[in-house]
């Protein structure tokens, strides 16, 4: 017998954010760390290219704002999904409260990154 009214899951939404965050973290975060954490301090990229006005101009553009928001929020969604499923794997069955705590943390980081970008 086929169930005509199956229970719908919200898991595809979380898996989508998990996958997008993992992709962002694997592909864009290392380049960002290389440029901002290694090349600029070593002087390979001149300090005049990273002055306040240029960086503020980039961050306040739509592409720059989306990049900064994505760099903060996407890895956070990935990490919180891992924490949620990691707790389950370690037999910490927190149920809905753990799920809400993990995903609310990621949502809070996303909202704060958006708010702080608009404060610049």
Curated annotation (Swiss-Prot):
Q: Where in the cell is it found?
A: Cell inner membrane
Which Pfam families does the record associate with it?
Fumarate_red_D
GO terms (molecular function) for this protein are: succinate dehydrogenase activity
Concerning SUPFAM superfamilies, the annotation shows:
Fumarate reductase respiratory complex transmembrane subunits
Q: Which CDD domains match?
A: QFR_TypeD_subunitD
Membrane-topology descriptor: Multi-pass membrane protein
Describe the task this protein carries out.
Anchors the catalytic components of the fumarate reductase complex to the cell membrane, binds quinones.
Q: Which family does it belong to?
A: Belongs to the FrdD family.
- Subunit annotation: Part of an enzyme complex containing four subunits: a flavoprotein (FrdA), an iron-sulfur protein (FrdB), and two hydrophobic anchor proteins (FrdC and FrdD).
Q: What is this protein called?
A: Fumarate reductase subunit D
């Amino acid at each position: 017998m086929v169930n005509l009214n199956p229970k719908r899951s919200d898991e595809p939404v979380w898996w989508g954010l998990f996958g997008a965050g993992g992709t962002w973290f694997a592909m864009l975060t290392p380049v960002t760390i290389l440029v901002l954490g290694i090349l600029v301090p070593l002087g390979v990229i001149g300090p005049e290219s990273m002055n306040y006005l240029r960086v503020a101009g980039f961050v306040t553009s739509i592409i720059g704002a989306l990049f900064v928001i994505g760099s903060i929020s996407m890895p956070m969604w990935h990490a919180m999904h891992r924490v949620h499923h990691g707790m389950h794997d370690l037999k910490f069955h927190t149920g809905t409260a753990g799920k809400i705590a993990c995903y609310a943390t990621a949502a809070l980081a996303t909202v704060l990154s958006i708010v702080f970008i608009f404060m610049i």
